[in-house]
Every structure is written in C-alpha cells, then in structure tokens.
Swiss-Prot record:
This is T-complex protein 1 subunit theta. Transmembrane segments: none annotated. One of its GO terms (biological process) is chaperone mediated protein folding independent of cofactor. It comes from Saccharomyces cerevisiae (strain ATCC 204508 / S288c). Heterooligomeric complex of about 850 to 900 kDa that forms two stacked rings, 12 to 16 nm in diameter.
C-alpha cells in the first residue's frame, strides 16, 4: 500500500504558492492575536501622557511619534486582517484628523472581548448583530450627552476649547503655545460669517508650517502670508510695501532652450564665436525685457535659473525666487491669483498675480522669504514658523499642528461645534448606559452588547495607566462619581467627572470644566463608527486566501558573510 501524502486543500484550484486559512484552523483567533500585538503597541501611546515610539521605516528614516495613523503607515504590515484596522485609522485621519488612537484601541478591544464570546459558543453573526445594535444605541446616547457648543467659530477663545485638547493629546506640556499658534493662524484665514448660522469655508491647505532649526518652541511665530525657507536668487531681496506688485510664475527653466539631441557647430574664426554667444545674450535679453515691460516685479521659478537670465533680471530690478516644489507653486498661485506658465516669455495681464509685499527675513541662522497677501484683516494663507532643537521633534510638532487644524475643519461641519466631556468621562458614562440597554435586550445578543460596553473601559483605564495612577483605585472612583449624585447638584454634573492625569486629587477624579477638556461630538461619533465597522469586518471573515507574491526571488536584505568578492 503506497503512502498518501497530505495535500493543501484546493491544491488544484490555485497556483502553487498560495496560502489558505479557515475557521477550522482557528484563523479568527489567530487574526485577533495578531491584532492584539498591534493593539498593545498603540495602547501605551494614547492620551496626553502617552509614550512615543521610534520607528525606522524601510527607507531608513527615523520617525518619533505617538500618533497611531503615522505609526501604522510607516510600519510594513502584511497581515490582511490587521490591514483592515490600518485602513480604518487612515480614514479617521483623513476625515477628522484626531481620534486615530481611539479607533485602533477601541477596535482592538472589541475584538479582544469578542474572543471570550467565541469561546463561550456564540457565533460571529450573533456578535456582529449585537455590536451593530450597541453602536446605533451609542450614537443616539452621544447626542444626549452634549455639554456645550461652539457657536461663534471666529472667536479665538471658542476655538481654543476645541484645539487645545486635540494638541495636548499629542504634545502634552506644550499645548498652550501650540494651540495659541493654531488659533491665531486660523483666525487670519477664516472668513467672517455674513449672517447668523452661516458656516464659513475653511481650507486646511491655507495653514502652512515652516520648520527652522534652532531656538525653542517659545520662539515660534505666525506670519500672515506664505513663507519659503530660502532667499531670492539675485541681488533684489525685497519689494516695497507701498503698492501691490505683479508676480509671474514659471514652471519651466529660466534659461536658453536646449535641443534634446546633441549638435555640432563648426566655427571658422573668432568673430563667429563672438557672434554665436551674442545671439544667445540678445535672445535672453529680449525675453527678460518683454517680462519687465509687462510690469512684472517678482518672478517665481519652478525649475532652474540660468546665470545669464539672472544677470538681466538683476539689471531690470526683478526679484527671482526659486521654488522647486510643485505643491508650493500651486499654493502660491492660489495666494497671488497667478497662472503657472510652462513657457518662457511675456505673460498676459490675466496670467499675472498680485502680492502686497515680498521681503527677506532672517530667523535664527536661516534666511526666509515672505509673501504677504492680505485682504483687509483676512489673508488667503497663514504660515506657522516652528523653532526647535531637533528635526524629529519639529516633525512631531508639525503632526500635532496638522491634527489641530483638521479639528477646525471638523468644526465647520453642520454638527461640528457640539462638545462632549473629555478625559474618559464620556466612555465611563457610556459603559453604564450600554450595559443597562443590554440588560433590557432579550436573547444571546445581550452578551455581545454588554461586552461592547466593557470595551469602552479601555479608554479611562489607559489614561490612568499612562499617567502613572493606580487603575484599581481610579476606575472604581470614576464609576462611583458617575452613579452617585450629590445633594443639590445639577442632574448632569456627573457627566463632567473624568480622569485626573495630573494626580492633583487623591481619588484620581476631577471636574473637566476646570481645564476645559472636551471632545468633539463629530470626531467621537466617527471614531466609534469606524472602529465598530473594522471589528465587525474582521469577525465576518471566515477564510483568508493569500496568493503568491508577484515577482522573482528577492535579494537578501543583510550583508553576505565573508569577503564581498568571494565566489559561491
């Protein structure tokens, strides 16, 4: 009798090299275990006292951050179930800017508690149904827990209520300086609502960040206009402020056009050689004179600037700035109202832009060029100049500012101004309300609903752990503060009890109104929605089929042992 070797199921269906994992092999438990590893990594980075991670990506770049979306984007994750959560955090980052850690941690905790339900015998379908019922109930309860609303979106003090908690979750200790910078920059570009109830248009691209090494964070400033981290090319470094100046933007090189193929020129005598160079000079001189005759006083070049062209531009008193980034060119065109030109020549009046002033400033040891374009009190763009000791720290501060600016974008949505209690107070209140809802639900679905409520405990527990508090004391005190109403207190006073990360009280509980710690309703709703959908998506998968990767054999990553020229 011949020996029968075991074969992979569906071996004749797919090409050689595929992998298949089904629930019979315990794939859902393995997927939850893989997600748990990532969940534990992001857990310690949540909250104002969250720890940073040093990540070296595949290009060798060093990133220091505690933002979940940034960490997951730089990591080379290959597990397909984990990638579902990575996409969820990316969606939260794109739409809301803040709450990425909440999405990752809540989705991971929902899957952690679902593992217990699976071991009890509940099917994935029942867990998904219970989670969806609890999610709908949670979103309704959040509307009833609103404790404030930002009505005047042009008021800096009102904006600080929303910007400060977002930035403090990333850069705790520097939130006062950074939130002031962001609110000032936003107030420069945010148009005033013409009538009551009108939502002003806000573009996150209107806030730019320029990082300059040296100094400290307290030396950071906000400038109305656009700042480039380089100085003009020629002798003209600044333009006066007494009038508006015409600006021409070119995406082509400011130089003599060269042929794509090589050519040979035969010169018989010295006069022919002189005439050859004179023709080039006359051609460039004529082009620059045409531009100067149009009244252009500033040229922004997206490519190289030739020495001969620069000589004639200096003669005509035209300021020349080289901006290699096409994205910066696009923003500058929007600020000045100019049209980028792909050809070298005199622009038409419609293609020219206007700028109020262009000047060169020295900040630290660097020379920067400032383009100011103001319309009364409102500018089309505003730039935050950041100062710091290390490039990694400046990059992390820039990410915190981006989150604060994105929060302002969420504020401009129809229901974006509503605020919820922060510091874990909302989650503690949701636990009791969802648990009571689960007790009223008949059947096995109540088990999934109650576990959905248990998952929210991860937020206050993590805030207390990262702050160095005793979780076994803080959590019972929080539950007691939300369930006991003091005599003479307002009915909603218990909603304001959150985690005291500073440890000022013995109980570890504080009134969040003292520090104005609030969360945005729109951000919280979106995060709970995305996290629940990601968790239910992973639970609904019963089989993972992975095809063989395309491409040939890869070179080994590490160095070969022995001498480099040794033959095999």
């Amino acid at each position: 009798m011949s020996l029968r070797l075991p074969q992979n199921p569906n071996a004749g269906l797919f090409k050689q090299g595929y992998n298949s994992y089904s629930n019979a092999d315990g794939q859902i438990i393995k997927s939850i275990a893989a997600i748990r590893e990532l969940h534990q990594m992001c857990l310690t980075s949540m909250g104002p006292c969250g720890r940073n991670k040093i990540i070296v990506n595949h290009l060798g770049k060093i990133i220091i951050t505690n933002d979940a979306a940034t960490m997951l984007r730089e990591l080379d994750i290959v597990h397909p179930a984990v990638k579902v959560l990575v996409m969820a955090t990316e969606q939260q980052k794109i739409d809301m800017g803040d709450g990425t850690n909440l999405v990752m941690i809540l989705a991971g905790e929902l899957l952690n508690v679902s593992e217990k339900l699976i071991s009890m015998g509940l099917s994935a379908v029942e867990i998904i149904q219970g989670y969806n019922m609890a999610r709908k109930f949670t979103l309704k309860e959040l509307d009833e827990m609103v404790v404030g609303e930002i009505t005047d979106k042009n008021d800096k003090n009102e904006l600080l209520k929303m910007i400060k908690p977002v930035i403090s979750s990333k850069k705790y200790g520097s939130e006062d300086i950074l939130s002031e910078l962001v609110s000032e920059a936003v107030s420069h570009v945010l148009p005033v609502a013409q009538q009551a109830g009108e939502i002003p248009y806000f573009n996150v691209d209107s806030i730019r960040v320029v990082k300059i090494m040296g100094g400290s964070l307290s030396n950071s400033t906000v400038i109305k206009g656009m700042v480039f981290n380089r100085e003009p090319e020629g002798h003209v470094k600044s333009l006066s402020e007494d009038k508006k100046h015409k600006v021409a933007v070119f995406t082509c090189p400011l130089d003599i056009a060269n042929t794509e193929t090589k050519g040979t020129v035969l010169l018989h005598n010295a006069q022919e050689m002189l005439d050859f160079s004179k023709g080039e000079e006359k051609q460039i001189d004529a082009m620059m004179k045409e531009i100067a005759d149009m009244g252009v006083e500033c040229i922004v070049a997206g490519a190289g600037v030739g020495e001969l062209a620069l000589h004639y531009l200096n003669r005509y008193g035209i300021l020349v700035l080289k901006v290699p980034s096409k994205f910066e060119l696009r923003r500058l065109c929007r600020v000045c109202g100019a049209t980028p030109l792909p050809r070298l020549g005199a622009p038409t009046p419609e293609e020219l832009g206007l700028v109020e002033t262009v000047k060169t400033m020295e900040i630290g040891g660097d020379r920067v060029t400032v383009f100011k374009q103001e319309q009364g009190e409102i500018s089309r763009t505003s730039t935050i100049i950041l100062r710091g000791a290390t490039q990694n720290n400046l990059d992390d501060i820039e990410r915190a500012i981006d989150d604060g600016v994105a929060a302002v974008k969420g504020l401009m949505k129809p229901s974006g101004g509503k605020l919820l209690p922060g510091a874990g107070a909302t989650e503690i209140e949701l636990i009791s309300r969802i648990t009571k809802y689960g007790e009223r639900t008949p059947g096995l679905l109540q088990l999934a609903i109650k576990q959905f409520a248990v998952a929210f405990e991860v937020v206050p527990r993590t805030l207390a752990e990262t702050a160095g508090l005793d979780v076994n004391e803080v959590l019972p005190n929080l539950y007691a503060a939300h369930n006991v109403t003091e005599p003479g207190a307002v009915k909603t006073d218990h909603l304001y009890k959150g985690v005291d990360i500073d440890g000022e009280s013995d109980e570890g509980v504080k009134d969040i109104r003292e520090e104005n710690i609030y969360d945005m309703l729109a951000t919280k709703k979106f995060a709970i929605n995305v996290a629940t959908e990601a968790a239910t998506t992973v639970l609904s998968i019963d089989q993972i089929i992975m095809a063989k990767k395309a491409g040939g054999p890869r070179a080994p990553q590490g160095p070969r042992p022995g001498n480099w020229d040794q033959e095999d």
